[in-house]
Amino acid sequence: MHLETGKADQAFREEVADFLGQHLSQELRQAGRRTMGICSPHEASQAWQKILYAKGWAAPSWPVEHGGTGWTPMQRHIFATECHLADAPMLAPMGLEMVAPAIMGHGNEAQKSFYLPRILSAEDSWCQGYSEPGSGSDLASLQCRADKDGDDY
């Protein structure tokens, strides 16, 4: 796929590449190259998120009112591409991409003002665990059944 970009997008690409060149240490690049799963090792991911946070780039997909960048879809694509090409560590997605959107959509103002800045700045790290009666965290062993009770189940 070939994406046409204009002068503004090319200038943005250069800004991102310059930033990455100045702020990605060899250690962070090595961590980025070693990434095998959905995110880089915690220490590298957190360190990189703090650098991006200081620049205002930690959450490109977030709304501006919550600390997002306000970038266009093309700018987000350019940023992701340049980060990949530079071997930047992958950020842990749980807080930024799963918990924060749930808080934005369903949290009250006190929850938003407390949790969102802490997620954005990498002050807090989030994880998700599952546990079900009789199965614990072994979700593959879950069993479901429906018992007819009158007109419903």
Predicted ranges, named:
Residues 1-30, 47, 57-58, 65-66, ...:
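Flavin-dependent oxidoreductase catalytic core characteristic
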Residues 4, 8, 12, 37-40, ...:
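Catalytic cores of large soluble enzymes that bind and process phosphate-bearing ligands
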Residues 18, 77, 144:
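Active-site phosphate/pyrophosphate- and oxyanion-stabilizing loops and adjacent acidic/basic residues
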Residues 68-69, 110-153:
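Glycine-rich, Trp-frequent "lid" loop and neighboring beta-strands that shape
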